[in-house]
Amino acid sequence: MNIDDKLEGLFLKCGGIDEMQSSRAMVVMGGVSGQSAVSGELQESVLQDRSLPHQEILAADEVLQESEMRQQDMISHDELMVHEETVKNDEEQMDTHERLPQGLQYALNVPISVKQEITFTDVSEQLMRDKKQVREPVDLQKKKKRKQRSPAKILTINEDGSLGLKTPKSHVCEHCNAAFRTNYHLQRHVFIHTGEKPFQCSQCDMRFIQKYLLQRHEKIHTGEKPFRCDECGMRFIQKYHMERHKRTHSGEKPYQCEYCLQYFSRTDRVLKHKRMCHENHDKKLNRCAIKGGLLTSEEDSGFSTSPKDNSLPKKKRQKTEKKSSGMDKESVLDKSDLKKDKNDYLPLYSSSTKVKDEYMVAEYAVEMPHSSVGGSHLEDASGEIHPPKLVLKKINSKRSLKQPLEQSQTISPLSSYEDSKVSKYAFELVDKQALLDSEGSADIDQVDNLQEGPSKPVHSSTNYDDAMQFLKKKRYLQAASNNSREYALNVGTIASQPSVTQAAVASVIDESTTASILDSQALNVEIKSNHDKNVIPDEVLQTLLDHYSHKPNGQHEISFSVADTEVTSSISINSSDVPEVTQSENVGSSSQASSSDKANMLQEYSKFLQQALDRTSQNDAYLNSPSLNFVTDNQTLPNPPAFSSIDKQVYAAMPINSFRSGMNSPLRTTPDKSHFGLIVGDSQHPFPFSGDETNHASATSTADFLDQVTSQKKAEAQPVHQAYQMSSFEQPFRAPYHGSRAGIATQFSTANGQVNLRGPGTSAEFSEFPLVNVNDNRAGMTSSPDATTGQTFG
């Protein structure tokens, strides 16, 4: 067999079954014969590479030719048309070969021959495929004809036994495009979309779309149950109900759950089982997956607690491994482990919002490590962590406060925290006898540190209301127990008013500041802290504030005296003359010898104020509550009181802004004087009360007022008061106050028991008070016991 025959057999294999019947295929073979030498050599080399003998290939070619010749009559016209198109494509390829140079033809012929040989993996398999392809065409044509056939009518058997033709589904619904065979079925279907129910029950007015539904419903009213169970005799309206019931007797369970492969006898039970078991289980799995995703995301973000995990013992690490089930044990911590590891230090977080979200203020506080470990720990961490951060630790309520306050000096870097963040937590300033005794002269530095960072609470309570109730009761319990410190600042409002607390503490501790002027909020804090310790009655102080809180701005001194011959005491308690006893006692330098004298002096001063208020309240026009009760039986204080600071800060510095000019009061004087400064001269010169204005409509003369006060005093019991002279106060403590309050003290001049008052302001400064007239060029106003020479203050 020559090369042309071989090429002819190969192209027949590639072309298909019907290639032998095409005349164009023979033409192609003839056209290619000019190149037979080159292509034949290439194909022979490929065949030799595949180790296939020439005899087997030739035998296969002969078998294919014979089988194709036997089937030439069965080839359809369509297949011949497809074959012609393939031949045209082959011709185009050959034309490209002829046009290309000789060098490119070799390159193009090599892959063509390879592709041809790849299709023939095995000769025996190829023969079997060819035999199947010979049988397939006729069968495929028959199947295609059956699918494509759509007969116009279908032969049916009617109810009477006659034959009939049935038309296909030509009626289509406009709403859902459903097709029906008859218009009746279509109209019945349309009722579903329109909601129309033409069939109505005559007994219960229920309506139905179809007539058979109505008939089945009417059986309920008639009680007819045509379907009966053979085993138990139960009857049913529907046949489906009877068949479902029979499965209970037979034990048949045809419905299976697709999740757990359990079998059930009814479909509703399968649905109920899926809802109860598998759907809830899937939800739980989804939740677990979400939690697991969150945990892994925390691991990826680097939010680990490795210092905590490395300190865990072996048993606790095993417990965390069991609970995490394969997760990283450095990222998952159990809550029980956190409760047990109270002695371990929590990790240092860079943001304070973590502290806000994670920890309760009532259970956590600032605490430094113990001296044995904390020193090296802080030194090592100081070079790595910038800036220094809080070390938080959970406080056990049963533990006592073991650490002294000298560690608070090491917490000075806490000033880097913002006030707005620190003010979210309410802390209490430490006031304990043992802690204060251990400090000594370092009291001032400690309070400075306490201003920067909140200290540890004395008691650890889980309820904030209980803590506040304890603070309210504590003021009565600590009245006579604290001898070392004058001011117990139980400030519960440090969170809302941090600046007020700092100002109050600074005014108590600072030695250089002799007369610090505080705002009204700071004064409120001072009043609470002072009268709790000094056992001065709350009613007295409250009445003093209420009585003189409606004075105009700028009052620095109010000079008044009681026209009483029995009151022989020359009490001159001015804000500039009060010794600085409390400040010296705050730093531990007070003397216990003069404490009893000062206590008696302040007790006498309290009684003096009460008597003055009793007299003025009877004649004052704007005291609307005549039933004011004042406690006069003050107990002797075991510790030196601090009324001097009250006189200094409250009565000399509180601004009063509500003056009512329409009311008459014998105690109102020039509006530029302060609240209380009892400037009383020598004992033999009693001074009268003088009014600050002359009301021409209803004015009370000074003589009438003095006569009234004198008559009332003679009728009353005459108490004996101890005389205190100016020389009784220590001179070293007077000097700072005279120096600092020089601007206020220059307004007064005392000569022979008479007080001269000069107001720096004019009537223009108080234009809202028409009855007040103060001129700069008028002479000094003199207050004397003589009613004829006494002038009213205006």
From Swiss-Prot:
GO terms for biological process: gamete generation; negative regulation of gene expression; positive regulation of transcription by RNA polymerase II. This is Zinc finger protein 148. A zinc finger (C2H2-type) spans 171-193, 199-221, 227-249, 255-278. Gene3D superfamilies: Classic Zinc Finger (3.30.160.60). Belongs to the krueppel C2H2-type zinc-finger protein family. Keywords: Acetylation, DNA-binding, Isopeptide bond, Metal-binding, Nucleus, Phosphoprotein, Repeat, Repressor, Transcription, Transcription regulation, Ubl conjugation, Zinc, Zinc-finger. GO terms for molecular function: DNA-binding transcription factor activity; DNA-binding transcription repressor activity, RNA polymerase II-specific; RNA polymerase II cis-regulatory region sequence-specific DNA binding; zinc ion binding. Residues 574-588 have a biased composition (Polar residues). Interacts with HNRNPDL. Interacts with the 5FMC complex; the interaction requires association with CHTOP. Interacts with CAVIN1.
